[in-house]
């Protein structure tokens, strides 16, 4: 009973801390408001036009709709799509806010969203909506910053989880029959023939781009930064070596 009470206390403390993370909550609220608005437009018959205007596509970028690289992240195709991304933003975003502050959280999310969008334009197809690129950036950034952390309930290290996600998304991106990659796309075609076409309806290229951006950001943060003191010590070492 004491153990259970302790667990509940820890959970309550965690929820109280997460409730004080403004950037994560702000993103979730904006996503919800945008989805409510787009669903209203769908009901009035204007939904497709707005999705084509704000969702990301090669055609849209060719027509000069450069805002799509940002706006696609705020749109979602359905309530389940929105719900999954909102929960992940809440879980991962609030953790990053606690670790590094709201600016870092917003920066990682936005850069991941942009990187995911660019990778979709390069390797994906169709209309892209959703903040999945930002979510993947948060996930892989946290996994790279804390590689030895255990991920529950999976019981594996964050490092191995991150590697598995990146490899999986790379394989699924290249296996998409629409991409036409030699050999590997034929495997994707076999999956489609066996009733698994829905696998390629997800934005795997977007996930891959966002995840890679998260890793790059984390590695940059982990790299030792030069300071005046470090430069002074390096100069003294070079001077000592030159006198020998």
Question: Where are each of the predicted segments found?
Answer:
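Residue-level signal for the membrane-embedded core of alpha-helical transmembrane segments
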Residues: 3, 24, 83-87, 135, ...
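Transmembrane helix-loop-helix
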Residues: 11-14, 66-150, 179-180, 184-209
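Interfacial/capping segments of alpha-helical transmembrane domains
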Residues: 40-59
């Amino acid at each position: 009973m004491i153990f259970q009470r302790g667990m509940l206390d820890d959970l309550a403390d965690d929820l109280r801390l997460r409730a004080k993370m403004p950037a994560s909550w702000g993103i979730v609220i904006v996503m919800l408001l945008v989805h409510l608005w787009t669903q209203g437009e769908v009901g009035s018959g204007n939904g497709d036009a707005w999705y084509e205007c704000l969702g990301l596509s090669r055609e849209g970028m060719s027509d000069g709709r450069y805002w799509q690289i940002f706006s696609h992240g705020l749109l979602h195709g359905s309530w389940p799509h929105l719900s999954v991304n909102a929960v992940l933003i809440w879980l991962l975003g609030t953790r990053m806010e606690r670790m590094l502050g709201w600016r870092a959280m917003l920066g990682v999310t936005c850069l991941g969203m942009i990187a995911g969008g660019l990778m979709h334009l390069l390797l994906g197809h169709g209309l892209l909506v959703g903040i999945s690129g930002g979510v993947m950036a948060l996930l892989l950034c946290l996994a790279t910053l804390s590689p030895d952390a255990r991920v529950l309930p999976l019981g594996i290290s964050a490092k191995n989880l991150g590697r598995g996600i990146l490899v999986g998304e790379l394989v699924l991106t290249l296996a998409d029959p629409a991409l036409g990659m030699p050999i590997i796309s034929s495997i994707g075609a076999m999956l489609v023939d066996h009733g698994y076409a829905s696998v390629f309806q997800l934005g795997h290229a977007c996930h891959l781009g966002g995840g890679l951006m998260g890793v790059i950001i984390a590695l940059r943060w982990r790299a030792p930064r030069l300071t005046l003191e470090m430069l002074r010590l390096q100069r003294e070492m070079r001077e000592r070596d030159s006198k020998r």
